[in-house]
Amino acid sequence: IAHVGSNCQLEAMELARHAQEVEADAFAAMAPCFFKPSSVKDLVDFFTPIAQSAPDLPFYYYNMPSMTGVSLSVPSFLIEGKKTMPNLVGTKFTHNNLMEMGECLELNNGEFEVLHGYDEILHY
């Protein structure tokens, strides 16, 4: 999974196109941490052109509030984002809110993949 995240939307779009050109299996991006989106709509609006830059690859939202400072509803993002990003397949969920993670797993009968990214709470 190629990470294409950037505070610059145009740069992220270019990286997404490159990921598709080199036949990555998928791509992911974190929310911008400089000009932070303040709503799910803002987050969807930021990611839509990025996801559309590599329409043939699965796209994951890399949710990591501890690094980005963006803490918006991931289930709401997945539902709203799917409307404009057909290649949105899930999230890398790097947060300790297991209730929200469970909501993501159950959305639309398990439509979305949820990659667990918070290693500190995994048992060995």
Regions found by a protein language model. Give the residues of each.
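Active-site beta->alpha loop and helix N-cap motifs at the rims of alpha/beta catalytic domains
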Residues: 1-70
